[in-house]
C-alpha cells in the first residue's frame, strides 16, 4: 500500500519525469537540477470552476516575490482529474503561453503525480517548491491562508536568489 504526500516528511528526494507538452510531445521538467523549481500543479476544475488559489497565483505573477535568478516557475496540468474537455483546456493554455511566455505542461496520465507520490490531487491547485538538488521542500495542497502566504514567502525567498 502506498502512502500519501501528507504522510511523508519534507524535504524528500524526487526525480525528474518525462510527461507531455501541450502538443503531446514528450518533455522533462524544465531546468530540473539546474534551478530551483516553483511548480503549480493544477486540476483545471480547481482553477476554472472553483477559483482555488487563483488570486494568490495572480498576486505572485504581479508582485514578482517568487521570481529570481535561481528559481523557475511553471505549471503542470492535472488532466486525469478534470471533468472539463482536455482539448479545450489545451487551447486555453496555448493562448496563455503565446500571450505571456508561460511554461505549461500536461500530466495527462498521472505520471508526475504517481512518480512523486502526491496523493489525492483532485480539485487541488497545488504549489510545490523543489530545490536544484532534487528535493521537494514545500507543498501547498489547499487554499492558502494569510499564515500560509507568510510561510510560502519565507520558504521561496531561500530558493529564488
What label would you give each PLM region?
Residues 29-53:
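Short active-site neighborhood of thiol/selenol oxidoreductases, capturing the structured segment around
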Residues 7-27, 48-52:
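N-terminal "domain-start" segment that seeds a small globular fold
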Residues 47-97, 113:
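Structural microenvironment flanking redox-active thiols in thiol-disulfide oxidoreductases
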Residues 123-161:
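Thiol-/selenol-based redox modules, centered on thioredoxin-like
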Residues 1-7:
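Hydrophobic h-region of N-terminal signal peptides that target proteins for export
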Residues 20, 102-109:
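Short acidic-hydrophobic, aromatic-tinged amphipathic segments that line or gate anion-handling sites
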Residues 15, 99-103, 118-128:
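Structural micro-motif
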Amino acid at each position: 500500500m502506498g502512502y500519501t504526500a501528507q504522510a511523508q516528511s519534507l524535504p524528500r528526494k524526487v526525480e525528474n519525469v518525462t510527461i507531455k507538452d501541450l502538443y503531446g510531445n514528450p518533455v522533462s521538467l524544465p531546468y530540473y537540477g539546474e534551478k530551483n523549481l516553483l511548480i503549480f500543479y493544477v486540476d483545471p476544475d480547481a482553477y476554472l470552476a472553483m477559483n482555488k488559489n487563483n488570486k494568490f497565483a495572480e498576486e505572485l505573477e504581479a508582485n514578482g516575490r517568487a521570481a529570481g535568478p535561481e528559481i523557475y516557475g511553471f505549471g503542470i496540468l492535472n488532466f486525469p482529474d478534470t471533468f472539463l474537455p482536455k482539448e479545450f483546456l489545451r487551447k486555453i493554455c496555448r493562448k496563455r503561453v503565446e500571450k505571456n511566455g508561460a511554461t505549461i505542461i500536461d500530466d495527462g496520465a498521472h505520471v508526475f503525480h504517481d512518480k512523486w507520490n502526491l496523493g489525492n490531487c483532485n480539485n487541488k491547485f497545488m504549489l510545490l517548491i523543489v530545490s536544484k538538488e532534487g528535493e521537494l521542500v514545500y507543498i501547498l495542497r489547499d487554499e492558502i491562508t494569510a499564515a500560509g502566504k507568510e510561510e510560502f514567502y519565507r520558504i521561496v525567498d531561500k530558493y529564488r536568489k
